[in-house]
Amino acid sequence: MSENKVNLLDFDRNALRAFFADELGEKAFRADQIMKWIYHFGCDDFSQMTNVNKALREKLARIAEIRAPEISTEQRSSDGTIKWAMRVGDQEVETVYIPEADRATLCVSSQVGCALECKFCSTGQQGFNRNLTVSEIIGQVWRAAQVVGFPKDTGKRVITNVVMMGMGEPLLNLSNLVPALSLMMEDFGFGLSKRRVTVSTSGVVPALDKLGDMIDVALAISLHAPNDKLRSEIMPINDKYNIQEFLGSVQRYLSKSNANHGRVTVEYVLLDHVNDDMEHARELAELLKDTPSKINLIPFNPFPSNPYGKPSNSRVDRFSKVLMEYGYTVIVRKTRGDDIDAACGQLVGDVIDRTKRTMKKRMQEQEISVKML
């Protein structure tokens, strides 16, 4: 396909309607027709869009395309989890489909690599390359649906939930993230409830404040430590935005949101004998007392060349019980897809050579400091 063609996956509904009116001289409802073909029927061939007049179909074929990332490899876990490496330009990101009895969740990437360097995350140890475009984010959902089924194929919505918990820090790609989220929830898009679309962040405070003014989705926060000293050791972003600043922005977001039922999901990776003592649990409980929360405990998933270990079941149970004694809803996340390196913190993809890492990191730090303010 020609690089000069406009990729319609890069437009949310408002932008697509404007494109049809301003660039094509067409009525806005024609954009809605095309969106239904793309997102409800999984169609990427204009000639097959039979309720669209032939002249418009031919015009679109000349100037536009519907291009999602291609699947490079597919791995299927014994538990039903599917991990895809998807080609974005000359690199790859990873997308994970997690089916359960009552839902099916798609874990989507927002960047090629990640600049935040969280010590327990495989992606963070690989370096940062670039942000994904709107089409590369929403295209992961489109391509996954092509494999597992669009509603017109199955008679039901196969992908019921989307979590922005793949490669990258979503809030460092806000300008492309928000239109993609809109397409996930738009009736002419994938039509998901805002309570079924979750953005996870490690604490980019200015961007979280901005997100709350732009769109309403479920929020999960990557906390992973109950105090600044420990969090800074395992999550360098804490040196820029400490826990109290982070939780302050969370509370501001919750005050604007209807998608979260007034509480945030707190993600806490349990690292053996690092952040999983009973005293850590008590400290965490006190820390969150003013932030309505449900807590997801995630036993660490080891990966090569990482110093951390997975805690024993007894340590996980003790930690969980302390939090429940304080009245918190606690879920111990079941590890899914670890036999194909698709579990939390294991996504790597095909990212940059480490010799480019310093330059990319500096650019990303400038984005944190300047662009989001």
Swiss-Prot record:
Tell me a Gene Ontology molecular-function term this record carries.
tRNA binding
Instruction: Name the InterPro entries on file.
Output: Aldolase_TIM, Methyltransferase_A, RlmN_N, RNA_MTrfase_RlmN, rRNA_lsu_MTrfase_RlmN/Cfr, rSAM
Q: Does the keyword Nucleotidyltransferase apply?
A: no
Q: How is the cofactor bound?
A: Binds 1 [4Fe-4S] cluster. The cluster is coordinated with 3 cysteines and an exchangeable S-adenosyl-L-methionine.
Single GO BP term: rRNA base methylation
Q: Write out the annotated subcellular location.
A: Cytoplasm
Kindly list the positions annotated as binding S-adenosyl-L-methionine: G168, E169, S200, S222, L223, H224, N301
Name this protein carries in UniProt: Dual-specificity RNA methyltransferase RlmN
Source organism per entry reads Tolumonas auensis (strain DSM 9187 / NBRC 110442 / TA 4)
